[in-house]
Amino acid sequence: MKILKTLTLRGPNYWSIRRKKLIVMRLDLEDLADKPSNEIPGFYDGLVEVLPSLVEHYCSPGHRGGFLERVKEGTYMGHIVEHVALELQELTKMPVGFGRTRETATPGIYNVVFEYVDEQAGRYAGRAAVRLCRSIVDTGTYPLKELEQDLSDLQDLQANASLGPSTQTLVTEAEARNIPWMALSARAMVQLGYGVHQKRIQATLSNYSGILAVELACDKEGTKTILQDAGVPVPRGTTIQFFEELESAIDDVGGYPIVIKPLDGNHGRGITIDINSWKEAEEAYDLASEESKTRTVIVERFYKGSDHRLLVINGKLVAVAERVPAHVIGDDKHTIEELIDITNEDPRRGEGHDNVLTRIKVDKTVLGMLDKQGLRLDSILDKGEIVYLRATANLSTGGSAIDRTDDIHPENLWMAERVAKIIGLDIMGIDVVTPDITKPLRDVDGVIVEVNAAPGFRMHVAPSQGLSRNVAAPVMDMLFPPESPSRVPIVAITGTNGKTTTTRLTAHIYRQTGKVVGYTSTDGVYIGEYLVEKGDNTGPFSAGMILKDPTVEVAVLESARGGILRSGLAFDTCDVGIVLNVAADHLGLGDINTIEQMARVKGVVAEVVHADGYAVLNADDPLVAAMAEQVKGKVAYFSMNPDNEIIHNHTRRDGMAAVYENGYISILEGQFTLRIEEAVNVPMTMGGMAPFMIANALAACLAAFCQGVDIEDIRQGVRTFKASANQTPGRMNLFNLGDYHALVDYAHNPAGYEAVGEFVKNWKGQRLGVVGGPGDRRDEDLILLGKIAARVFDRILVKEDDDKRGRARGEAADLIIDGILSENDKADYEAILDETEAIEYGLDKVDKGGLVVIFPESVTRAISLINRRNPI
């Protein structure tokens, strides 16, 4: 078996709208193409031995063990690889379940589709599944050592890529509120919301976490001084930078017991508490000094009591946890080392922050703590005896938590909220040492030891004892108060032809409202009036660029076939999804071989329209009109025929539509007709002579109307939008060159040629065409381009693209010429393969009063050649 290609889908896609995270692996079964599993000796038994947990896969039989029944009866290897890839992820606690395997048009080559949690782990699972299945085919088994290595690698990949527990808590709450989110590449930052409504978080820092407050929280001594000046009970202490100052510092705080910690530490690193001797103080100083970036150390009086974390969000105390240091409880049988291992077997414990609790690690701090208690790792404790392994209670070092939110004294609650206001942090963790949180700190000699920016949420969300607190909810309430938006309107546009023009017109209409519009197209990414990135930008990366921009108020996104197949859409839902048409273009590419399959690709845009949005569909195209059956939102139709039956039935049910009637672009709402503008007054329609441009205008006007854009803004938009080289390069750009005219259009498929031909046929003078086609199109498509050219033009110059896309030089041109001659064996044609030469020749040779129509590979090049001739 051989993996030919692997795609990672990250949004709604051809295979599934709901399951956005999919791996699509193109797999050549090679020698196994004609061998079902029941014909491979020992395969079933080997697979069950290696992965007995596959018994949990239902598959098409619909019951436990169903998949293994299929293997025993006989199924092909692509299907088995799919299930193995899923199971490998399941075994590493990545919940997945969706899969599909489909044979392509090439016998023996399959698309194996399966769900993933982490994309790198998903891709690895696909490769490992192929290795595993191949090994069982060849040897009857898969070595246990290799399986264990695969599972270990998968765990590492997931751990390295997954969100931290606090961030995951916030993201989960955002999802519950239908707030979109996306991971940003910068320092584990996450964006919540789109465009102008976005907020950002990094762990539990937010947009509102001011730099001064964060810096102050990191400055332990500065924080203590400010709180002390405000009358807040804080430890008596001082700072030193040199070892020689340690003895006097101990005297200054009143002698032993003391605490020594780094000035700028976190997560409990470098802290030693309950120091009672000079030797301990020396060791603690060295530890703290090494941990401090500035070599500055805090020496404080030690206060007896339990460690508590108070969490304040947006000025309100939302949770309290008592933190218990890492410890073991004796059973009169096991050594301390064995008890640590037993404790670490708790499924809630993981490495670092990847689970509710962290595994306890034995290091010099643990050994020192045991030594201080006269114990060693091989010591056996009495039953019920508790031995603490660390002095600090951080969860990151194996500690646990008990919820105390309902126990805190009102005065302590008030003090915590006051401290948050004094420091100025929106999300703050306050560390308190007190023997009794139910009593005021002053009454029990309790103190606030420090405050923390970016506090962890694990101890509150999943305490070892007590109630779980949804501390993410108040964060979301702060970032997105009730009724405040998190999304910008998204208009997604797809189709075979007309996408870019419709995208630009829709964006132009929205700009009449005064909003900042971001849009993507085959020309580039634009925000407002400005080009941000040049080139073909119709995929999810470019859409993400718009949705990440903090100035964008409306997103208009051209969504082409290629991006949908390669990565899926960049958004989960849209407000308007426009499908203009589906024609025979790009067939044979990406395993899309029929026009019906292409309609399924384009239909993704209609299917992601949310319940209150509109799918704007072409009622004149049966494949597009049929998409209404899959739409979860509302449907609005457009048609060049006011008598279209679909339009009539739809408006009779008070539906919304746009039609071209009596020369007008009109909106129908139920039985009411609202005329936007006469087509002759809409520049892009070439005085009403370009029907396909009228259809594009219908779609754009209807989309804007569905979104509540004022009629006058729509009217002004279509009146001022021109099919010029500046506004819509490569879309019906007509140039007056004095004695003749030139027209540049990026049509590159039969439907596009037909559409331009409808306009060209009305030209009174000579019609000269400079034609070509992409080399990766089917032979029959290139032949059809030639047939259409022969019907439209008096004279034809056949050229080729610079990028031959896998064909030999002259091959694409020969197919077009075959089409020309099959339509008209007396056609006036000439082959000039170089595009620049063909354009120059056409412009030189066209008759006076004639029209040169150029279908270029490079729109920029064609326009540049024309501009050199100084068009009027």
UniProtKB/Swiss-Prot annotation:
E.C. number: 6.3.2.29, 6.3.2.30
Keyword Metal-binding: no
ATP-grasp domain mapped to chain residues: 224-480
InterPro entries to which the protein is assigned, alphabetical: ATP-grasp, CbamoylP_synth_lsu-like_ATP-bd, Cya_phycin_syn, Cyanophycin_syn_N, Mur-like_cat_sf, Mur_ligase_C, Mur_ligase_C_dom_sf, Mur_ligase_cen
Catalytic reactions of this protein: [L-4-(L-arginin-2-N-yl)aspartate](n) + L-aspartate + ATP = [L-4-(L-arginin-2-N-yl)aspartate](n)-L-aspartate + ADP + phosphate + H(+); [L-4-(L-arginin-2-N-yl)aspartate](n)-L-aspartate + L-arginine + ATP = [L-4-(L-arginin-2-N-yl)aspartate](n+1) + ADP + phosphate + H(+)
GO molecular function, one term: cyanophycin synthetase activity (L-arginine-adding)
Enzyme class: ligase
Keyword Amino-acid biosynthesis listed: no
Superkingdom of origin: Bacteria
Keywords: ATP-binding, Ligase, Nucleotide-binding
Gene that produces this protein: cphA
Binding-site list for ATP: 495-501
Protein name: Cyanophycin synthetase
Protein family per UniProt: In the C-terminal section; belongs to the MurCDEF family.
Subunit-structure text: Homodimer.
Role played: Catalyzes the ATP-dependent polymerization of arginine and aspartate to multi-L-arginyl-poly-L-aspartic acid (cyanophycin; a water-insoluble reserve polymer).
GO biological process, one term: biosynthetic process
